Curated annotation (Swiss-Prot):
Pfam families: Crystall. The lineage of its organism: Eukaryota, Metazoa, Chordata, Craniata, Vertebrata. It comes from Oryctolagus cuniculus. Has a two-domain beta-structure, folded into four very similar Greek key motifs. One of its GO terms (molecular function) is structural constituent of eye lens. Residues 2-16 are annotated as: N-terminal arm. The modification N-acetylalanine is found at residue 2. Keywords: Acetylation, Eye lens protein, Repeat. This is Beta-crystallin B2. The gene is CRYBB2. Residues 193-205 are annotated as: C-terminal arm. SMART domains: XTALbg.
Amino acid sequence: MASDHQTQAGKPQPLNPKIIIFEQENFQGHSHELNGPCPNLKETGVEKAGSVLVQAGPWVGYEQANCKGEQFVFEKGEYPRWDSWTSSRRTDSLSSLRPIKVDSQEHKIILYENPNFTGKKMEIIDDDVPSFHAHGYQEKVSSVRVQSGTWVGYQYPGYRGLQYLLEKGDYKDSSDFGAPHPQVQSVRRIRDMQWHQRGAFHPTN
């Protein structure tokens, strides 16, 4: 077991999370900066999220207050209007947000056909899968075991449809990760911050 000093010296530390919410599209109008969880965006004085700028992430946003409803994963970058952060195009409502903890360089996830980790399964290690069908997995996804890393699952192939944040842990039923139906057809890793060049960490030469 490495000591705290060794752990801190052995890998770069993430920057503090930072996201800016603008009331209007294209980063116009009244704005508010967040550095931590926000259970109700309206309490910050922002009536409606028209655009989002993520300066250090990743984050997850929710359709409803108190982190409920449809989920939206935000990684470092610009989101000039609502349809740039929703892959379902079902709602333009963004009411609460929280930072996502990315604490592992390795990624391993197991998806199961039935609840309680039974039935046919598909194991994914350190890879993004845009289509489960192309990998020969035709089944529904009713339970998930995330052994390492942080992932986002999608309702449809090609990273489309409803998004489901999958953090380390066990999800015995699809409702545990917020899915109305046991339908997940693509999945990708969240590799932001210190381990991915797209993230907020910039190594020194």
